[in-house]
């Protein structure tokens, strides 16, 4: 997008990292419940509300499991791309096996009365919810999070890809796999709940945390087959949930680590620094502002929920900034085309032919992709996305103003002021850091054997972008960084 907009990249990296601060706490919850399930602490007759309240209101327990989640994540990414690939292969294969096993048991449970009402509810449509802005906002945020859309994940992992990688097929496969797993997980949960809970609609309306940590342990404790099957089912579920959380943590934190590495920081130092920050900045979400809902008697982490609200919705701006870089690239290519052909003045048709389609032609339809992407992609990117973004964000803020008491009160965790304050301060700080960002070199890591000259890659002719192993001799860095030389990670 240009050097003036480097702060947008920092925003994208920060949003992902900020989500990681509190997501490490959530991952710790999953690990805690897996250990409790495996030891028989979530069996029949256990008061799951009491288990949840005791755990959440004991900061030492929450922090211990948060620390464990951080350590596992840092260990997985310490050695770089190959280690990440091996860990993810093990975790994802295990996740599939565990999830399908739990789905099979849930189908048996739901089919006992011959109705499959959990399956029916899962795919039933309630038109009134389609008219609520919150439905679409939540759906977009969930999609952005689960597919890593707008988080810069694919941009980060691109440094490990071959030049001839079929990114189109990979993106389609990723979305298909993600949505398939989401449907399978939803079916597993819904069919299990509807099979044993007397008031399933009340159970599923309590939110994802209530369903996961309060309802499901009770549901699995009543599964047919006796104590052995019940223990296996609840243990498998929370082990699968822990694996899913850890894979998300790995990709989220690798984004932060990789950005440090690209700016010349040794990987071991980047992992150590990021791990320390992840733990320290996650402590407030683990221990602060733990409240009790008087109507239900269930504890909830108010500080964590506020952070999730702020940075989760901030993902939409990350997506906007990435889209902006595509728009800017198209405009720059159009101006270059004008200069090369001595054309003066703006022409819509010329812009559509030589500007709008340029990103698709240069980076998507490279000749290495099996699925050719047509002009429909341009319409979605240039028209569909900005219109959708404007409508959803406008609806979101209108909904806050109309349906939240005292929305302008900065102490209101559900108000509009606290969201704008966090977003605004973050954007201002990053704008001030923009000059510092563009004065530092970036180190490009071409995998061994790729044999791709750096000047043939996008941005390779920029004197601020160096091949891994080259020495930076510029004068804008401090003395400790003037002669940074990095060694390849991908041996």
Q: How would you name each of these model-derived features?
A:
Residues 15-28, 147-158, 174, 178, ...:
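Membrane-helix boundary/coupling elements in multi-pass transport proteins
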Residues 23, 73-83, 104-116, 131-133, ...:
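Transmembrane helix-loop junctions in multi-pass membrane proteins
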Residues 296, 302-322, 373-461, 469:
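A generic transmembrane alpha-helix motif of multi-pass inner-membrane proteins
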Residues 3-20, 53-56, 68-91, 156-165, ...:
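Membrane-water interface regions at transmembrane-helix termini and the short interhelical loops
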Residues 1-11, 24-81, 112-137, 210-213, ...:
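Inter-helical loop and helix-membrane interface segments of multi-pass membrane transporters/permeases
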Residues 245-252, 270-285, 289, 308-365, ...:
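Hydrophobic alpha-helical segments of multi-pass membrane transport proteins
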Residues 344-357, 442-491:
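Non-transmembrane, juxtamembrane loop and terminal tail segments
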Residues 85-250, 261-265, 269-273, 277-278, ...:
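Membrane-embedded translocation segments of transport machinery
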């Amino acid at each position: 997008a240009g050097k003036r907009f480097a702060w947008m990249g920092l925003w994208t990296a920060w949003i992902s990292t900020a989500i990681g601060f509190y997501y490490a706490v959530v991952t710790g919850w999953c690990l805690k419940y897996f250990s409790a399930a495996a030891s028989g602490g979530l069996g029949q007759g256990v008061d799951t509300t009491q288990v949840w309240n005791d755990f959440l209101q004991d900061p030492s327990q929450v922090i211990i499991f948060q620390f464990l989640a951080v350590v596992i994540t840092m260990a997985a990414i310490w050695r770089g791309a190959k280690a990440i690939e091996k860990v993810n292969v093990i975790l994802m294969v295990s996740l599939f096996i565990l999830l399908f096993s739990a789905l099979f048991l849930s189908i048996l449970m739901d089919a006992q009365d011959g109705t499959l009402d959990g399956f029916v509810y899962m795919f039933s449509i309630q038109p009134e919810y389609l008219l609520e802005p919150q439905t679409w906002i939540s759906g977009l945020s969930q999609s952005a999070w689960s597919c890593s859309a707008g988080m810069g994940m694919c941009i980060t992992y691109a440094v490990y890809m071959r030049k001839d990688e079929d990114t189109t097929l990979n993106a389609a496969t990723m979305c298909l796999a993600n949505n398939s797993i989401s449907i399978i997980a939803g079916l597993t949960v819904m069919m299990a709940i509807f099979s044993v809970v007397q008031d399933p609609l009340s159970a599923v309306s309590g939110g994802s945390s209530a369903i996961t940590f309060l309802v499901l342990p009770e549901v699995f404790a009543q599964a047919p087959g006796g104590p052995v099957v019940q223990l296996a089912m609840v243990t498998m579920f929370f082990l699968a949930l822990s694996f899913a959380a850890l894979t998300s943590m790995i990709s989220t934190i690798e984004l932060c680590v990789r950005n440090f590495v690209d700016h010349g920081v040794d990987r071991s130092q980047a992992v150590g620094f990021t791990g320390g920050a992840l733990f320290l900045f996650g402590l407030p979400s683990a221990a602060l502002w733990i409240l009790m809902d008087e109507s239900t008697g269930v504890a909830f982490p108010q500080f964590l929920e506020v952070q999730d609200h702020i940075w989760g919705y901030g993902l939409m701006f990350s997506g906007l900034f990435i889209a902006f870089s595509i728009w800017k690239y198209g405009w720059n290519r159009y101006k270059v085309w004008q200069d090369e052909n001595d054309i003066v003045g703006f022409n819509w048709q010329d812009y559509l032919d030589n500007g709008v389609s340029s990103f698709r032609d240069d980076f998507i339809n490279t000749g290495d992709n099996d699925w050719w992407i047509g002009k429909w992609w341009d319409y979605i990117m240039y028209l569909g996305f900005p219109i959708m973004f404007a409508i959803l964000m406008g609806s979101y803020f209108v909904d806050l103003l109309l349906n939240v008491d005292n929305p302008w009160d900065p102490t209101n965790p559900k108000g509009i002021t606290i969201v704008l304050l966090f977003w605004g301060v973050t954007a201002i700080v990053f704008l001030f850091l923009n000059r510092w960002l563009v004065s530092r070199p970036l180190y490009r890591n071409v995998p061994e054997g790729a044999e791709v000259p750096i000047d043939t890659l996008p941005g390779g002719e920029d004197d601020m972008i160096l091949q891994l192993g080259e020495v930076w001799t510029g004068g804008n860095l401090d003395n400790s960084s003037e002669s940074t030389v990095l060694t390849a990670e991908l041996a």
